[in-house]
Amino acid sequence: MPRIKDGFKGERAIVLPAFLIEELKQDPLGSELYITDIGYYPHAYFHYRKRDTEEVTEFILIYCMEGEGWFELDKHQYAVTANQFFILPEHQAHAYGSNEENPWTIYWIHFNGTKAAFFSAGFDRPKSITPQEDSRIKER
């Protein structure tokens, strides 16, 4: 099976420039919680990422909008289904990918800051979100 980290049809990604991230790190308010990268991967066939500890310099939130995927953290593997999210902590090796038969559609955010660990606490396992009539997710 091929493994792809990006390049999906219809994908969107924004990576903040390094100088802007450095400014945020110095800002009294901005340094508490800031985004470094944000994106959307629709129907991400063969999506796969594996990072060693030294490569993980931010927290990573992944929200599965459709389909299925998985992630590995601390030698445990977790299944992820539609309307679930998880946050991978900084400085921890991990891997994740889409299901071969039913690949996920995901939104993802890399973030950091002095309050990032507080913000992400308890979300290192899949958490479900129940869509509501006024969720507006389909408008995105």
What do the predicted segments below correspond to?
Residues 1-34, 129:
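A short, N-terminal "cap"/entry segment at the start of jelly-roll beta-barrel domains
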Residues 118-140:
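Amphipathic alpha-helical segments enriched in hydrophobic/aromatic residues interleaved with Lys/Arg
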Residues 17, 113, 134-135:
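Short, structured coil/loop segments at alpha-helix boundaries
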Residues 30-126:
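N-terminal regulatory/effector-sensing and dimerization cores
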Residues 28, 58, 131-135:
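Generic detection of long, well-ordered alpha-helical segments
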